């Protein structure tokens, strides 16, 4: 379970960055 949460926490900021173009 923890690796999944850690993966999501890593993935979400990059998705937000890609959508909003604010990194």
Curated annotation (Swiss-Prot):
Disulfide bonds join 17-23. Expressed by the skin glands. One of its GO terms (cellular component) is extracellular region. It is found in: Secreted. GO terms for biological process: defense response to Gram-negative bacterium; defense response to Gram-positive bacterium; histamine secretion by mast cell; positive regulation of mast cell degranulation. Keywords: Amphibian defense peptide, Antibiotic, Antimicrobial, Disulfide bond, Inflammatory response, Mast cell degranulation, Secreted. Pfam families: Antimicrobial_1. Mast cell degranulating peptide. Causes histamine release from rat peritoneal mast cells in vitro. Has antibacterial activity against the Gram-negative bacterium E.coli K12 and Gram-positive bacterium M.luteus NCT C2665. This is Brevinin-1SE.
